[in-house]
Swiss-Prot record:
Gene name tied to this protein: PAO5
Flavoprotein among keywords: yes
Protein name per UniProt: Polyamine oxidase 5
Main location: other
Source species: Oryza sativa subsp. japonica
Coiled coil ranges: none
Cofactor(s) of this protein: FAD
Swiss-Prot/TrEMBL catalytic activity: spermine + O2 + H2O = 3-aminopropanal + spermidine + H2O2; norspermine + O2 + H2O = norspermidine + 3-aminopropanal + H2O2; thermospermine + O2 + H2O = 3-aminopropanal + spermidine + H2O2
Cofactor note: Binds 1 FAD per subunit.
Molecular function (Gene Ontology), one example: spermine oxidase activity
């Protein structure tokens, strides 16, 4: 597939020149109003296609969700720009909108989304772990992970990353840790699990470090992702509260059936619903999807990470980016993101991933907050009660059924290619469909643009309109102001 160009991608920010203004425009239904679906709809709309976007929720954004009930923006889903650099496909739009980023780390993206010196870790008795121990263990953890590359080269078959770590430690006794240092190592593993949104025994040795990582480190979206969603969605034909139940391909047309009995007909459809929804077979296909497509959906992993956001009357915690609790097992570790440092608001966000996150969803909001506060008070005995809280449930939310995709142990080599591939007039997009940047917002965005371009080319050939509805010359306003509008970064 061709990579998306900035020219075809951006929303509401173009002056376009298109031939054939009197021809009947091709029609496309985009299913899913997350950033991938909105990007696809925006791109096709800018190419003068007739585009209808159907979204099951009562809002846009999908797993990108900015909540304002605290009186400030809180992203309860995606919240970082992974790769603060011009190569990031979202960079032009973020710069143009003047959205501020708070950079939380350098380029060591796979291991950490925060620099080690920004952590304050505490043991079970509330004593802060000396920074030199945190730094030393972090360096040891990196050495252990580098040694797993040798294990990978020695084994043809895949294995869980934790198994490879055990092999490394058996071979290198000097890397083994005990006592408090061992607990800090478990906390590092906890953070690795959060990156992949799954437990370490599910993380693939062959694929854990194969992601194409952009430069520039990680940037927290201080204003949230909501302004990006609104900018891209401007003037699109959007239907909220439209849950798709069936997709029919017949006579070179695509019929999309909605839960309330309504049907929409178009020349093609782009499916951007989350991987978890596809895995649950909530949407029926007629004819059924081919086996190669079904197996790609089945073989891709889906992880879960949830947030418990807590607003307090005042700040009682140290001025660091992350507060962490170390423990003898990674599941017993925990951490809080300090939004006060980035935004000035007295907010902590507890983040839980993997099986622990699934267990959390069985609790009520109040029970979740009580548990989180009990952990916080062990770290900081003077902690006060929150005045407001928010709790996410991405795993059981019927509109998501998971947070983002992950590589399971033994993943077939061609898995992403099969998942991305179209089936007739059906095209697939979303974070799980981005080969190089799965699990990220910019990956989902880029995937939507690629699917839109593939759909445009397909319909141009099928409908015999190859000379029409082509994007000849697109002038992006951000191209004219790119030099004048740099990233707004509050921490260098």
């Amino acid at each position: 597939m061709d990579q998306p160009s900035n020219g075809f991608a951006a929303g509401g920010l173009f002056l376009r020149h298109i031939d054939g203004q009197n021809a009947s425009p091709p029609s496309v239904i985009v299913i899913g109003g997350g950033i991938s679906g909105i990007a696809a709809a925006r791109a096709l709309s800018n190419a003068s296609f007739k585009v209808t976007l159907l979204e099951s929720r009562d809002r846009l954004g999908g797993r990108v969700h900015t909540d304002y009930s605290f009186g400030c923006p809180i992203d309860m889903g995606a919240s970082w720009l992974h790769g603060v650099c011009n190569e990031n496909s979202l960079a032009p739009l973020i710069r143009l909108l003047g959205l501020r980023l708070y950079r939380t780390s350098g380029d060591n993206s796979v291991l950490y989304d925060h620099d080690l010196e920004s952590y304050a870790l505490f043991d079970k008795d509330g004593r802060q772990v000396p920074q030199e121990i945190v730094t030393k263990v972090g360096e040891t953890f990196e050495k252990i992970l580098k040694e797993t590359v040798k294990v990978r080269a020695e084994h043809e078959d895949d294995m869980p990353l934790i198994q490879a770590i055990s092999i490394v430690l058996d071979r290198n006794p000097h890397l083994k840790l005990d006592g408090l240092q061992y607990e800090v190592l478990q906390w590092c593993i906890c953070r690795l699990e959060a990156w992949f949104a799954t437990d370490v025994d599910n993380i693939s040795l062959k694929n854990w470090d194969q992601e194409h990582v952009l430069t520039g480190g990680h940037g927290l979206m201080v204003h949230g992702y909501d302004p990006v969603i609104k900018a891209l969605a401007q003037d699109l034909d959007i239907h909220l509260n439209h849950r798709v139940t069936k997709i029919i391909q017949r006579y070179n047309k695509t019929i999309v059936c909605v839960e309330d009995g309504t049907s929409f007909v178009a020349d093609a459809a782009i499916i951007t619903v989350p991987l978890g929804v596809l895995k649950a077979n909530i949407i029926k296909f007629e004819p059924e999807l081919p086996d190669w497509k079904l197996s790609s959906i089945s073989d891709l992993g889906i992880g879960i990470e949830n947030k418990i956001a807590l607003r307090f009357n005042s700040v009682f915690w140290p001025n660091v980016e992350v507060l962490g609790r170390v423990a003898p097992t990674s599941n017993a570790c925990g951490y809080f993101l300090n939004l006060h440092k980035a935004t000035g608001h007295p907010v902590l966000v507890c983040m839980v991933a993997g099986r622990f996150a699934y267990e959390f969803e069985k609790l009520s909001d109040e029970e979740s907050v009580n548990f989180v506060m009990s952990q916080l008070k062990k770290m900081l005995p003077g902690a006060t009660e929150p005045v407001q809280y928010l709790v996410s449930r991405w795993g059981t939310d019927p509109n998501s059924l998971g947070s983002y995709s992950c590589d399971l142990v033994g993943k077939p080599a061609d898995l992403y290619e099969r998942f991305c591939a179209p089936v007739g007039n059906l095209f697939f997009a979303g974070e799980a469909a981005c080969i190089d940047h799965s699990g990220s917002v910019h990956g989902a965005y880029s995937s939507g643009i690629v699917a839109a371009e593939d759909c445009r080319r397909h319909l141009s050939t099928q409908l015999g309109i190859s000379d029409l509805f082509q994007v000849g010359k697109i002038i992006m306003r951000e191209e004219m102001t790119e030099v004048m509008v740099p990233f707004q970064i509050s921490r260098l």
